[in-house]
């Protein structure tokens, strides 16, 4: 049996104790992947330019063509894009479909639409669209309470998955495929330091580990391939029990995935450890009464400010500090 016990421990080294837990039994752990354990996906510059393309480029019928993908691959990370760069920081942890929807809604707000769209952009519709955008900045993902014309919803529902697929194409070309290939040869290079050993340590204590991601999971390629490349064993009874992911066209916020997983496994959230670097999983973890550990670099000042505001219990830079074995013991 594993337990967290921070009594007698103090912040120092690579561990910051934000909100002490005391002593508590841990049976399950929910882990984010990107930035928390794997470094393969350098997603922020790719997402930034993909969203920027959507909100400024007009969303014409060919906005997601292969030619556009190649153009975005070449331009990814080449210049600062203040609004979308900031949105990627603020929205880390949201489902990719919500992040893509932001780009579509900003295009509507800016009037960057194809003439063929013929949307009913009345002052009321634009005001409601602006409300949704503001709520996205605050980390919300569900907006069914805001009434919108069917034509607006249909346009967003048609364009958003297409933008998601374009983003994945650009991600693959800009970094993901190259980094995954290198990870097969040099897996430690593409893991957060100490990540694999820490996961093995938790598994050895009897903790059941689950990966939860906003990426789409499919049998071959994608996130599943990346996780295997950095040497995490997945399957019942293995280091990681399962990989829970998203869908191309159905929004699946991480907090909802986590709640469904706890219900399915009949897990008391107070005995779960949540480890991540995104706002959604960490706020959900604190809201559900889990033990929460944010994995954030020392210079991630805005993210650290946000996570402290959510009320996380601990912040770590990586998993190398021996104090983690004192914090979590048998």
Language model region names:
Residues 2-80:
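Active-site neighborhood of HAD-like aspartate-dependent phosphohydrolases
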Residues 17-20, 25, 30, 149, ...:
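Short, acidic loop-to-helix structural element flanking the phosphoryl-transfer center
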Residues 67-151:
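Non-catalytic, alpha-helical, charged scaffold/linker segments
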Residues 196, 200-210, 214-245:
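Substrate-recognition/cap helix-loop segment adjacent to the acidic, metal-dependent catalytic center
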Residues 199-206, 262-263, 282-289:
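Surface-exposed amphipathic alpha-helices with a cationic face
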Residues 213-216, 221-229, 271-317:
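Acidic, Mg2+-coordinating phosphoryl-transfer loop and its flanking beta/alpha structural elements
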Residues 228, 250-266:
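Short loop-to-alpha-helix "cap/lid" segments that border enzyme active sites
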Residues 244-245, 312-323:
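Short acidic-hydrophobic, aromatic-tinged amphipathic segments that line or gate anion-handling sites
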